[in-house]
Amino acid sequence: FVDESEKKLLLKCYKFNCRSCGSNELKRVVSLGYQPLANNLLNKKNEKCELYPLEVNYCIKCHNCQLSVAVDPKKMFTNYLYTSSTSKVFRNHFVDAAKKYLKEFKLNKKKSYIIDIGSNDGVALKPFLDLGFKKILGIEPAKNLAKLANKNKIKTFNGFLEKKNIKKIKKNADLILASNVFAH
């Protein structure tokens, strides 16, 4: 049972139709109950936090699988606690990827413009910086992570990649990265 405020919250973010085809023929196939948002740690033992159903629905019409609830991205990413650079495996992966992209796409260290969408703390852009690239830009909605990336000399715009922010990107990119955006 949920109280009235939880009911309003759920109705606001619950997806009754398939995001691919629009059908309302969705069947719940996995339910992990009510969960807090990832990485949202409480400060006090009795502090209340919002819980969301963590469920996967299957569309009978087009076979798409989707989460039943889409939490407002601003709520999820305003202050995001996970920093990608804490993973040595992740750091090494992006070093290897940068070297591969440099060679495969014949990128020019002085002229090529590289953008990373959902750049977190700049983990995917740092290897390009270390290789001598001058024109890089991270786009990161979490204010704390954008600030951290900028502090580490990785130019990062704090915001979502949406129409109103597109004009802030000064030119066409030669390489666009979006390593972790689909995980959310």
Q: Could you say what each language-model-derived stretch is?
A:
Residues K99-H184:
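Conserved SAM-binding loop
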Residues L54-L131:
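Fe-S ferredoxin-like electron-transfer domains
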Residues D3-V89:
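N-terminal juxtadomain amphipathic helix
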Residues F1-L11, K15, P36, N40-L42, ...:
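Class I SAM-binding transferase module
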